[in-house]
């Protein structure tokens, strides 16, 4: 079982914590990670792109010249695709890019992402995280104590307005709950900061 240091809010090591092999010590499956990240990005797409077809562009209702006898190529409308200001053939229309992946693939990817943070020494486990008030300076102090000078994902076990609002104005810092944790965010942010209580919930869900 992987063992990592347990920190307090002052950045001091106050012990260690054993992490579940089934969640934080699995093999990293890059194929599953790729599949889930692509899926998440596809599901975020609005799909509102739209082009006008020949029947939708303005004008072009009259045949520009008679069919035969002019010496020119036959034309039915000045809004056919080959004309300037003509309609688009087979252009994009509003659509949904959303698709689902098997739950098993998602679980494998989540475990792989968490394992990659442990194996890369990019995880900080806090014994507790509590702020008396909404104060960005206090959260910056915690991050400085942990010597986190890059982007970080902060995971807490339950809703806490003081923590969320204290962290939201810090560039490169994002707060997540256990039930909103996702593979893309874990991989996107350099450091993974999680409370001890959140670790227990993650292991309960994914073990």
UniProtKB/Swiss-Prot annotation:
Residues 44-76 are annotated as: Disordered. Residues 60-71 have a biased composition (Basic residues). One of its GO terms (molecular function) is rRNA binding. One of its GO terms (cellular component) is ribonucleoprotein complex. One of the primary rRNA binding proteins, this protein initially binds near the 5'-end of the 23S rRNA. It is important during the early stages of 50S assembly. It makes multiple contacts with different domains of the 23S rRNA in the assembled 50S subunit and ribosome. Belongs to the universal ribosomal protein uL4 family. This is Large ribosomal subunit protein uL4. It comes from Ruminiclostridium cellulolyticum (strain ATCC 35319 / DSM 5812 / JCM 6584 / H10) (Clostridium cellulolyticum). The gene is rplD.
């Amino acid at each position: 079982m992987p063992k990592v240091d347990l920190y307090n809010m002052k950045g001091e090591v106050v012990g260690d914590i054993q992490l579940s092999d089934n969640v934080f010590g699995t093999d990293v499956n890059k194929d599953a990670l790729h599949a889930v990240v692509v899926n998440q990005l596809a599901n975020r797409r609005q799909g509102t792109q739209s082009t006008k077809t020949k029947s939708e562009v303005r004008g072009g209702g009259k045949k520009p010249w008679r069919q035969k006898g002019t010496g020119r190529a036959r034309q039915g409308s000045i809004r056919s695709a080959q004309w300037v200001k003509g309609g688009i053939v087979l252009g994009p229309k509003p659509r949904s890019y959303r698709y689902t992946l098997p739950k098993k693939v998602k679980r494998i990817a989540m475990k792989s992402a968490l394992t990659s943070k442990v194996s890369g020494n990019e995880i900080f486990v806090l014994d507790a995280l509590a702020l008396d008030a909404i104060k960005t300076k206090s959260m910056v102090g915690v991050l400085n104590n942990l010597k986190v000078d890059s982007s970080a994902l902060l995971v807490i076990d339950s809703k806490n307005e003081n923590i969320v609002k204290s962290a939201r104005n810090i560039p490169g810092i994002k707060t997540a709950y256990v039930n909103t944790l996702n593979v893309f965010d874990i991989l996107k942010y350099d450091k993974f900061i999680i409370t001890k209580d959140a670790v227990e919930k993650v292991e309960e869900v994914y073990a």
